[in-house]
């Protein structure tokens, strides 16, 4: 009989003849084995947790978050004032936040969110009216080629928050008609190209291949007259899409120790039609810091877009208010 068979028989005999003792040894061995296994698993879990925390901490370091929130309140009151005047109340909220990301693989992701929302009331009027209403999101994802230049893909989104109205008087009463709302219009622009960035104070994006879409609620276009358009969208339609090129940028500079100016601009060239027309937008924000919490700001916003209106649009806001820096 082979030796391995004899060995198996002997083992069986020993187990049968000393069953209680060997069962205790077997149980003890199993307890020691599984205790060691659990300890090893706990060490692996602790190591995994530590690696995950290190990764999360590193990702947090890759993000840079900064911005400003400003509240502005204006009020005027007149009584028996010979030269005249109207009582008024105006409130304005301005938010401008940046979220930037850079990792070791040289991927760059820059994001900017801007919100400006204000309302005003004049004595004698039946309705509050908008002083400002604007939401804009910019995002650029890029891969570094060298110190300053990157391959890029960008996204731009613009809309309003509150409904827009046309005010008129009929039969001696003030009336209003809704002419726009949130996401109507909504303007989306996408593009591929090159991104030049020296630092957070200056960048430029060139996109020879860009697409732009204007989206509206069909309720505003279904009753249009023949040839009439709503933000460039024809009767019964809900969008208009074009292909072109874009050039956009941002620059921040100090005029004095407590005065800074932000310049943002965007040019869009349409390849499909109206090639000679260039849509452009320029936004200048001058900030005067009085102290840590009080500041004044002057916003000058120019825009020309043939699809929206065939005239130069001008928006100007000045305010003194409370600032929260983040």
Where are the language model's segments positioned?
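Sec-dependent signal peptide cleavage junction
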Residues: 37-68
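Outer-membrane beta-barrel "beta-signal"
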Residues: 314-326
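Membrane-embedded beta-strand positions of outer-membrane beta-barrel proteins
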Residues: 67-69, 111, 153-155, 192, ...
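Transmembrane beta-strands of outer-membrane beta-barrel pores
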Residues: 71-77, 115-121, 157-163, 198, ...
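Residue-level signature of outer-membrane beta-barrel architecture
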Residues: 97-101, 139, 143, 155, ...
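Repeated loop/turn-to-beta-strand initiation elements of outer-membrane beta-barrel proteins
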Residues: 107-109, 148-151, 201-204, 258-261, ...
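Outer-membrane pore/translocation modules
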Residues: 129-242
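Extracellular loop and loop/strand-boundary signature of outer-membrane beta-barrel proteins
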Residues: 79-85, 121-127, 173-180, 229-237, ...
């Amino acid at each position: 009989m082979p030796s391995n068979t004899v060995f198996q028989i002997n083992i069986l005999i020993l187990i049968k003849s000393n069953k209680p003792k060997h069962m205790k040894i077997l149980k003890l061995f199993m307890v020691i084995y599984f205790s060691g296994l659990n300890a090893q698993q706990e060490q692996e879990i602790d190591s995994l947790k530590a690696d995950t925390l290190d990764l999360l901490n590193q990702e947090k370091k890759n993000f840079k978050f900064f911005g400003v929130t400003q509240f502005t309140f204006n009020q005027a009151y007149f009584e028996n004032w010979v030269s005249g005047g109207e009582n008024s109340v105006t409130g304005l909220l301005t938010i401008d936040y940046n979220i930037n990301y850079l990792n070791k693989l040289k991927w760059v992701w820059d994001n900017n969110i801007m919100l400006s929302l204000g309302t005003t009331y004049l004595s004698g009027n039946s309705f509050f009216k908008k002083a400002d209403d604007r939401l804009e999101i910019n995002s650029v994802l890029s891969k570094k080629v060298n110190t300053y230049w990157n391959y890029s893909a960008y996204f731009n989104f613009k809309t309003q928050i509150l409904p827009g109205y046309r005010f008129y008087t009929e039969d001696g009463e003030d009336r209003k008609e809704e002419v726009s709302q949130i996401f109507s219009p909504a303007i989306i622009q996408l593009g591929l190209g090159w991104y030049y960035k020296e630092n957070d104070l200056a960048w430029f994006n060139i996109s020879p291949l860009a697409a732009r879409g204007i989206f509206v609620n069909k309720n505003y276009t279904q009753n249009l007259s023949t040839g009439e358009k709503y933000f460039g969208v024809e009767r019964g339609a809900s969008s208009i899409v074009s292909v072109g090129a874009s050039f956009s940028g941002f620059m921040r500079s100090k005029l004095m120790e407590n005065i800074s100016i932000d310049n943002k601009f965007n040019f869009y060239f349409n390849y499909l039609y109206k090639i000679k027309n260039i849509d452009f937008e320029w936004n200048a924000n001058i900030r005067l810091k009085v102290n840590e919490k009080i500041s004044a700001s002057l916003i000058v916003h120019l825009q020309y877009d043939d699809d929206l209106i065939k005239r130069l649009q001008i928006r100007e806001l000045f305010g003194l208010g409370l600032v929260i820096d983040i």
